[in-house]
A protein has these predicted regions:
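Flexible, glycine-rich active-site loops centered on histidine and acidic residues
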Residues: 129-163
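Short beta-strand segments
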Residues: 8-11, 81, 111, 136-142, ...
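Condensing-enzyme catalytic core mediating Claisen C-C bond formation in acyl metabolism
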Residues: 1-49, 152-225, 229, 233, ...
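Buried hydrophobic positions in well-ordered alpha/beta secondary-structure cores of metabolic enzymes
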Residues: 7-9, 35, 64, 78, ...
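Catalytic phosphate/nucleotide-handling subdomain of diverse soluble enzymes
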Residues: 293-313, 319-339
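Phosphate/pyrophosphate-binding loops at sites that engage ATP/ADP/AMP, CoA/4′-phosphopantetheine
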Residues: 60-76, 233-250, 298-303
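Conserved catalytic cysteine-centered active-site region
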Residues: 34-55, 82-136, 141, 266-295
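Active-site pocket-lining segment
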Residues: 214, 227-232, 246-269
Length: 341
């Protein structure tokens, strides 16, 4: 008999350095008005040399563990969704496992670009639902600033660095992860990619690639058209799987790519402004981290209060997209803790 699953914790790991649009004006031809009007982004966090992918993931993990007030030693599985690991191996998940003190946890990384956290959540739910594991730590983390051309105003203005985490646990009562939905279309792989970072690089193993050869590349118009169709499709399909109506969803927590995509998708779903969870203005596009970071902040600011039906929906390179509808009932067991204090 399938076991129900619920989310019992959420956490964040955010770099300390804030880069505002005014800061970007100093070295590229842009302005705060130009960036904000097109993306909704006002500032983003950028990782220092010491703030690695694993370091941010560890911060998010510890924050989620504190939220749920569980012992790290009780975690059975750690899944890290990232496109920007510290190294090809060992996995970031193994580094997290050692740092938080979870010696019995299995650990692996998963790569599905900005949709990675949704894929990881779905995989974690399957392990819990099958009875294989009871407690699963899922982390989305990316440091895209290492792969940006800081002279290209079409890409460098969009991204920030960060990590967000969820803790799933077997549910004694009803299943609170109501449905998940995953999709991919590899014919669009060329629309958003970071080249020359793997074995396809012609001189892999002999000559390191030049920095210019491994910058993130994106067809912004094509990604916009893809996203504004993919998000409503995923939300409707996931709601149907969950046996609810779109109108029954209390909050939409979308991938924080940019404000235009979020607003266009919300309009197609006939959702009100107050139903949309967004922090893209403060953190930019943090890739696999953006959904848990947005929900984490909305909970801290009391926009989302339990119980609430939330639809988490992501899209990104691959192309990949997907959604999860969850009933959020967890409360921060630290009381009125503020992670920014």
């Amino acid at each position: 008999m399938p076991v129900g699953a619920k989310l019992i914790g959420v956490g964040a790991g955010i770099p300390s350095a804030v880069v505002t649009n005014a800061d970007l004006e100093k070295f590229i031809e842009t302005s705060d008005e130009w960036i904000a009007s097109r993306t909704g982004i006002r500032e983003r966090r950028i990782a220092s040399e010491e703030e690695t992918t694993s370091a941010l993931a560890i911060l998010a993990a510890k924050d989620a563990i504190a939220f749920a007030q569980i012992e790290p030693s009780t975690i059975d599985l750690i899944i890290v969704a990232t496109s920007t690991p510290d190294n090809l191996y060992p996995s970031t998940a193994c580094m997290v496992q050692a740092a938080i003190g979870a010696p019995r946890a299995a650990a692996f990384d998963l790569e599905a670009a900005c949709t990675g956290i949704i894929y990881a959540l779905a995989v974690g739910q399957q392990f819990v639902g099958s009875g294989t594991f009871k407690t699963v730590l899922v982390i989305g983390v990316d440091i895209h600033s290492r792969f940006l051309n800081w002279e290209d105003r079409n890409t460098c203005i969009l991204f920030g660095d960060g990590a967000g985490a969820f803790i799933l646990q077997a549910a004694d009562g009803e299943n609170e992860i109501l449905a998940t939905y995953l999709r991919a279309d590899g014919t669009g792989a060329h629309l958003l990619h970071i080249p020359n970072t793997g074995t396809a690089y012609p001189h892999a193993g002999t000559t390191p690639p030049k920095a210019m050869d491994r910058f993130l590349q994106m067809n912004g118009r094509a990604i916009y058209e893809f996203a504004v169709h993919a998000v409503p499709e995923a939300v409707r399909a996931t709601a149907a799987k969950a046996g609810i109506r779109v109108e029954d969803i209390d909050f939409l927590v979308p991938h924080q790519a940019n404000r235009r995509i979020i607003n266009a998708a919300a309009e197609r779903l006939n959702m009100r402004k107050e139903q949309i969870v967004s922090n893209v203005d403060e953190l930019g596009n943090t890739s696999a981290a953006s959904i848990p970071l947005a929900l984490w902040q909305a909970i801290r600011r009391k926009q989302v209060q339990p119980p609430a039906i939330c639809c988490l929906v992501g899209f990104g390179g691959g192309l990949t997209w997907g959604a999860a509808i969850v009933k959020w009932t967890a409360k921060d067991k630290r009381g009125d803790y503020n992670a920014e204090d």
